[in-house]
């Protein structure tokens, strides 16, 4: 299994809206990709901005490429997500999942 890790930041006042967008629109839409296994959304708030870490789980790098394209290290954004984000990591990082106890 492959874990795709990416980070983005919102202004503090946009954090709840972005979280709602992730949970109700973006992530449910990924369920249609065969080999997509789910995601974790992590959030850390401070006074000025909120950091989001999104970890998507896929069966293989081939499935990641179906989602992200051949240059799969580039971050993928829906136009609506850009309305919330004030800064982003341009690249996603991929890890091989070696153990899971969840």
What spans do the regions from the language model cover?
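Short acidic amphipathic segments
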Residues: 33-39
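Short, surface-exposed ligand-recognition loops at beta-strand->loop->(often short) alpha-helix junctions
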Residues: 9-22
């Amino acid at each position: 299994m492959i874990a795709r890790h990416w980070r983005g930041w919102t202004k503090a006042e946009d954090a709840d809206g972005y979280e709602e967008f992730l949970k109700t629109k973006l992530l449910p839409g990924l369920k249609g990709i065969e080999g997509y296994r789910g995601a974790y959304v992590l959030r850390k708030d401070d006074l000025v901005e909120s950091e989001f870490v999104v970890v998507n789980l896929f069966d293989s790098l081939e499935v990641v490429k179906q989602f992200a394209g051949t240059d799969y290290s580039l971050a993928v954004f829906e136009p609506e997500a850009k309305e919330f984000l004030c800064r982003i990591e341009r690249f996603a990082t991929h890890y091989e999942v070696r153990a899971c106890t969840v």
